[in-house]
Amino acid sequence: MRNIGFLSFGWWSGAPGSRVRTAGDVLEDTIRLAEAAEDAGMDGAWMRVHHFEQNTSSPFPLLAAMGARTSRVELGTGVINMRYENPLYMAEAAATADLISGGRLQLGVSRGSPESAADGPGTFGYPLPVGTTPAEDSAQRIAQFREAISGAGIAEPGAHAHVREGEKLPIQPHSPGLSDRIWYGAGGNDSARRVGELGMHLMSSTLVLEATGEPLGVVQSRQIDIFRTAWREAGHAGEPRVSVSRSIMPIVDDLTTTYFGPHLERDRMGANRDQIGEIDNAVSTFGKTYVGDLDKLEKELREDEAVMSADTLLVTIPNQLGADFNRITFDAFAELRERLRS
């Protein structure tokens, strides 16, 4: 593991204790989180994308603003449900945000996850075509998006187009290199293998769609190996990157003790462990929360095979506590990265 970033779920609510009470609050605070991560020496600022819920949804205006207020950190999504997207419009928006950031976007995409709306994509104007599965529909949209951001010509020219004979019109603007920075959120071994074959990077979260009774890190490490083997056998150039997400609560002062202390007590009682449950009709392994001082966190994370195998660790953060609180934990995460690198 050599990079560490945060993953904000982007929630807002008027609940007692929330520092992020409105949609406007969460947008401004997410920008401040990116600035705080950069100031602390972290490597990435990533955001969750969900629709029809009180959290961040349309990512590209926010990513552009984060890019304008930072200069170094990677800016990512975890993940964009492609069934909601017009791939060509998304290609324009993504390239625009990437150019504003100076080429720092890392875009995680997927076929989506369980959500609030009965048929969200259909409501957005993208009903599932007859005879097509959600996975197939998503795969087609991803392929079209990747072609569009590659700079390839995709539209037939009209009478007033300024192109050579036989050429097609590409999406504009084009951001060179963006097509090499597309990730896929894979839940199981088959999808991890397919991601490697297609030449996208792998995102693996705090759960996997497999339940063997083994720790999440062991199951996930096997998924990472499958992905890297598939990438290599497909002959792709460049480095196959992998991120894993974890819930990590560093206790470093009185304030973090106040918020995270109850989780530490559960940990001491043995109630904090990986669990097996069901999501989207699939039996899955859910990861535990890592909580404690830096020595304890370092020891336990070193024992997590997936964390040590991945190049990037994304820490899910309590974004509703606000950027000022999370800035305290960001210093701890940056130190953890240095410890785990050695």
Regions found by a protein language model. Name each.
Residues 4-8, 45-47, 75-78, 105-109, ...:
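Hydrophobic faces of well-ordered beta-strands that scaffold small-molecule active sites
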Residues 1-73:
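N-terminal beta1-alpha1-beta2 module of alpha/beta enzyme domains
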Residues 10-28, 80-88, 176-186, 284-295:
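Active-site mouth loops of central-metabolism enzymes
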Residues 44-66, 81, 206-217, 316-325:
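Glycine-rich, proline-tolerant flexible connector loops at the mouths of alpha/beta enzymes
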Residues 1-23, 84-154, 210:
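Flexible, glycine-rich active-site loops centered on histidine and acidic residues
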Residues 128-171, 204, 212-310:
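An alpha-helical appendage that flanks or caps ligand/catalytic pockets
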Residues 4, 41, 49, 66, ...:
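Conserved, mostly hydrophobic/aromatic
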Residues 188-211, 215-216:
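A conserved active-site cap/scaffold subdomain adjacent to cofactor or substrate pockets
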